[in-house]
């Protein structure tokens, strides 16, 4: 970052403005740091995604600057997209999970234009949005970006790069790529059992609901404790019920 900071004041200013714009825009509302934008940019120019000084050569920085207008637009459209399918700042437990989505929307062409230019048009790309959101919920639930994120981003990029002629986001290919590894996206019985332990207020709740009920309105606001008020399960309340039940 310090290379960009000192030698490219214009890009530094652009990054700061993008952070502010995404955070303050009601259609997005996510706080994204500069480092994330730079890592994403390295991903989009098909460079080494590891955040090291040697990866920010003048050539790499030049490519980012040359494509910055398109990169910036794609990033914003991606955050609008994930917000619309129900992800908010609390449920976005891995910002690295957004990077492959940005890559696909940037590289995939539809009718001669990058997919990010039309992904948020409601009369288009319904199936595409459905497949990408399914992958995203799976990734958040499985937490596969918790370690070795750079290696994972690189290998997912390889799968997507070889799938740009596919009709839709290569969900099945990505699942196949990681079968049997510690990044396996499949849900076995043991893992499904563990999902029952997701607690009230946990960021993964939303992702689980969407996988269970794909027809659910992504923008619906749920009041989780309406069925059984949460405060009725506090120790104090339960002791009160026990006292009433056992009173003579």
For every predicted segment, state its role.
Residues 1:
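Acidic, glycine- and histidine-enriched catalytic cores of nucleic acid- and nucleotide-handling enzymes
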Residues 6, 11-182:
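A cross-family structural signal marking well-folded subdomains
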Residues 242-248:
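C-terminal soluble interaction/assembly domains
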């Amino acid at each position: 970052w310090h290379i960009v900071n000192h030698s490219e004041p214009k890009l530094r200013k652009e990054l700061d403005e993008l952070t502010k714009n995404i955070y303050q825009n009601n259609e997005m509302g996510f706080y994204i740091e500069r480092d994330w934008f730079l890592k994403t940019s390295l991903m989009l120019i098909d460079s080494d995604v590891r955040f090291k000084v040697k990866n920010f050569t003048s050539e790499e920085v030049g490519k980012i600057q040359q494509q910055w207008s398109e990169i910036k637009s794609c990033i914003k459209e991606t955050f609008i997209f994930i917000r619309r399918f129900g992800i908010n700042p609390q449920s976005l437990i891995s910002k690295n999970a957004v990077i492959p989505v940005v890559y696909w929307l940037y590289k995939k062409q539809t009718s001669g234009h990058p997919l990010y230019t039309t992904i948020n048009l409601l009369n288009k790309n319904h199936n595409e949005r459905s497949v990408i959101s399914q992958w995203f919920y799976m990734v958040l639930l499985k937490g596969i970006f918790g370690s070795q994120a750079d290696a994972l981003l690189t290998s997912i990029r390889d799968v997507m790069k070889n799938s740009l002629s596919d009709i839709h986001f290569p969900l099945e290919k990505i699942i196949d790529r990681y079968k049997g590894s510690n990044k396996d996206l499949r849900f076995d019985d043991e893992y499904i059992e563990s999902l029952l332990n997701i607690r009230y207020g946990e960021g993964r709740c939303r992702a689980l609901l969407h996988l269970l009920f794909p027809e659910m309105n992504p923008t619906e606001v749920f009041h989780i404790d309406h069925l059984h008020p949460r405060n009725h399960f506090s120790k104090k309340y339960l002791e009160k019920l026990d006292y009433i039940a056992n009173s003579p």
